[in-house]
Amino acid sequence: MENLREQKGKIIAQTRAIKKLDDGFAVQSQNSKRFYFVDNNGACNCPDCQINGTTTCKHMFAVKYFLGIQKADGTTEKIRLTYGQAWHAYNQAQTSEVKQFEALLSDLLETIEEPERQGAGRPSLSLREQVFCSVKKVYSQMSSRRAKGLFDEAKEKALIKKSPYFNCVSALLNKEETTELLERLISLSAMPLKSVETQFAVDSSGFRTTRFSEYCRDKHGAEKKHEYLKAHILCGTKTNVICSAKITEGDGADSPQLSPLVQNTNESGFNVVELSADKAYNSINNFNTIREAGGFPYIPYRKGTAQTCRSGNRGKFWRRMYHYFQANQEEFSEHYHKRSNVETTFFMIKSKLGDCLKSKNFTAQKNELLCKLLAHNIIVLISEIYELGIAPQFAPFQEKEVVKSLHEN
């Protein structure tokens, strides 16, 4: 079904003047002789885009339709409208990723203030070095023993003072206290992009803890099922950076995780203007949480939902949004489509860092998955260094009790 802007765009393409320029198109207004400029990247200078923040206005639709019906020599030729890729920035980010990854990870971990060592004896490996080796190992997707060579290289580069034994990673990931540390590091790693991200999306996805081959099933007739952990994330829709994350068992519910994710993101200093999520997150509590954070929820309602079934003051905002959803479905859809970016984020993680966890128990698997999410954020930062020209500066790690408990255990 075409929305109103698309319908008007087709009318403009058929009845008004559209001129091809070197760097875009001049599109005549539907109601006046004024022209608006749509550049080759798909941005328009009309009030609908500049004031209302519309992502695809009627002038952009007019250009797309114009290119589709343009007749140069009496025949109809379809011309594909494409958007340029910043290949130079992309190539720089990809070719320098490994080197930049180590440097950014080291800078992030420098924000952890460790307590002074007490007593005599051989000094233990610092928490910074343990986390560095753990994230580096997960990023490489190597086994613990094979990753020992990576630790040796990091010592030669002076990124760590001591190359630890291969099982130091397993020891750290098996600690329950490591979970809170990694969750906070994920939030800190996203904060350099808080001036960029104001629109967010939330969802969950499963990561396998086991691997079964088709050969085993075909030969022995054994029916085996994969076991999963579920990652719940809230990410920015522009850069795909993860602002907050929680890990649950595979059958963990989605809806209860939205409130802590939004609260953590808001406390990290992000300006939550809007948040998109699917129907699984539609609840009074979630709507109120997003509103209290200053955001606007774009969460569709299930079929058969009756606004009269939600009474009381707590459901007032939920009912108001229900009426908005029913009366403005075209406008709602224009914002809701940004939710697909969270699926893109999961694809980025699984395609680059894998969708299978190597650890054997739930605590270690949970922390290994958090290391994947942290590694993803660092990769995003590397990309934005070249795309947006940012210079990441990390806020200090404030949770001293977490650091203390890890040192004691």
Residue ranges and their predicted role:
Residues 1-101:
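Long, low-complexity, compositionally biased intrinsically disordered regions
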Residues 61-64, 330-409:
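Basic, amphipathic alpha-helical segments enriched in Lys/Arg and hydrophobic/aromatic residues
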Residues 83-86, 119-122, 304-316, 392-403:
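Arg/Lys-rich, glycine/proline-spaced intrinsically disordered segments
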Residues 86-139, 158:
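Basic, short loop/linker segments at the boundary and entry of helix-turn-helix/winged-helix-like folds
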Residues 120-125, 142, 152-170:
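Short, basic interhelical loop/turn and adjoining N-cap
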Residues 279-280, 284-348:
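Helix-centered, glycine/charged polyanion-binding patches within enzymatic domains
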